[in-house]
Swiss-Prot record:
Example GO BP: L-leucine biosynthetic process
NCBIfam families reported for this sequence: leuB
Site (Important for catalysis): Y147, K198
Protein name as catalogued: 3-isopropylmalate dehydrogenase
Pathway as given in its UniProt record: Amino-acid biosynthesis; L-leucine biosynthesis; L-leucine from 3-methyl-2-oxobutanoate: step 3/4
Protein family per UniProt: Belongs to the isocitrate and isopropylmalate dehydrogenases family. LeuB type 1 subfamily.
Length: 367
């Protein structure tokens, strides 16, 4: 008898609403395990604030080792006011998530941002701007740039005039790697790459533009458009439908991907993937830990479920299953089911009810 293929997923629910929305992702995994001829094994590990409380560190060795032994990481959310008193490097994000990204060399962050037809009323943009919807993929460099550049610190010699500094630094190879990913992904889309920089002012952006132009020559069928960061922020508001793949440095990508997300009306709908060159990845909702929603059974689990869909697509290379999960979400929304954040003041369902409906729809689609 042929042995079933096995996949191992490290599950890191984290803090805030993370554990609640993760329960809904488990429902999807249960359906998939029953319906397909392979086995998905999950192991849960602590990270962030809960790990600080249990082990005194935001990224325990047990958690890191569990991730190393897995094919992918399904991540919830971390952080909360309980841990803001700690030194910056010991807080949940800087001490937990950032080192995890660095350890696995997760240099590319993908954030697909779509405006669902059934949710157009939630967008803050005028209906004439979003009448055609939009489908944007933000490709952000994740482990370089100003967040990691050295030196950084404070000058405290003059107590009356303290200064602080950070360093924005990128190498040719770093830019080439992320640009190559953006162009490859554009080939399966509308074949447009919008490269974002500030090349009229910043040396790092000047190099960014030079390298991206060189990479673009390997993709003659892809149109390359350069935009300054300030103009890009404006164009996203005026005409989001013009965009396809947006290629950004770490800082600019952090800003623009959140702006794109806001245009949909709810962060609770948006997944993200952080990948390395072998497509091992960490998959997480784009929103935060939302501690004010914790334990109320009202958080939107769709971003967590769609993050699982991205995990199947990129790390497990099972695009059919990824598509089925996305289709299950879409069909559930088309039936009119809404959590509080996307209810627009009308009747809404709970976190676990939304998970149940999506899992039921997935099961029906597979049958």
């Amino acid at each position: 008898m042929k042995k079933k293929k096995e996949y191992r997923i490290a599950v890191l629910p984290g803090d805030g609403i993370g554990p609640e929305v993760m329960q809904e992702a488990y429902k999807i995994l249960n359906v998939i395990n029953k319906k397909f001829d392979f086995n998905i094994y999950t192991n849960e590990y602590d990270i962030g604030g809960i790990a600080i409380d249990k082990y005194g560190a935001p990224l325990p060795k047990k958690t890191l080792n569990g991730c190393i032994e897995s094919h992918a990481i399904l991540f919830g959310s971390i952080g909360g006011k309980e841990w803001t008193h700690l030194p910056a490097d010991e807080q949940p994000e800087r001490g937990g998530l950032l080192p995890l990204r660095k350890f696995f060399n997760l240099f590319v962050n993908l954030r697909p941002i779509k405006l669902h037809f059934s949710l157009k009323k939630l967008s803050p943009l005028k209906k004439e701007i979003i009448q055609d919807g939009f489908d944007i993929l933000c490709v952000r460099e994740l482990i370089g740039g100003i967040y990691f550049g050295l030196p950084k610190g404070k000058n405290t010699f003059d107590k009356k005039n303290i200064s602080a500094f950070d360093t924005e630094i990128y190498s040719t190879k770093e830019i080439e790697k992320i640009a190559d990913i953006a162009f490859q992904l554009s080939l399966k889309r509308k074949k447009k790459v919008f490269s974002i920089d500030k090349a009229n002012v910043l040396e790092s952006s000047m190099l960014w533009r030079e390298v991206v132009i060189q990479v673009s020559k390997r993709y003659p069928n892809v149109e390359l458009i350069h935009l300054y960061i300030d103009n890009a922020a404006m164009q996203l508001i005026k005409n989001p439908n013009q965009f396809d793949v947006i290629l950004c440095s770490n800082l600019f990508g952090d800003i623009l991907s959140d702006e794109c997300a806001a245009l949909t009306g709810s962060l609770g709908m948006l997944p993200s993937a952080s990948l390395n060159e072998s497509f091992f990845g960490l998959f997480e909702p784009a929103g935060g830990s939302a501690p004010d929603l914790k334990g109320k059974n009202i958080a939107n689990p769709i971003a967590q479920i769609l993050s699982l869909a991205l995990l199947f697509k990129y790390s497990l290379q099972l695009e059919k299953i990824s598509h089925l999960i996305e289709l299950s979400v879409l069909k559930t929304l088309e039936k009119g089911y809404r959590t509080l954040d996307i209810s627009n003041g009308k009747k809404y369902i709970t976190t676990d009810q939304m998970g149940n409906y999506i899992a039921k729809t997935l099961s029906e689609l597979i049958n």
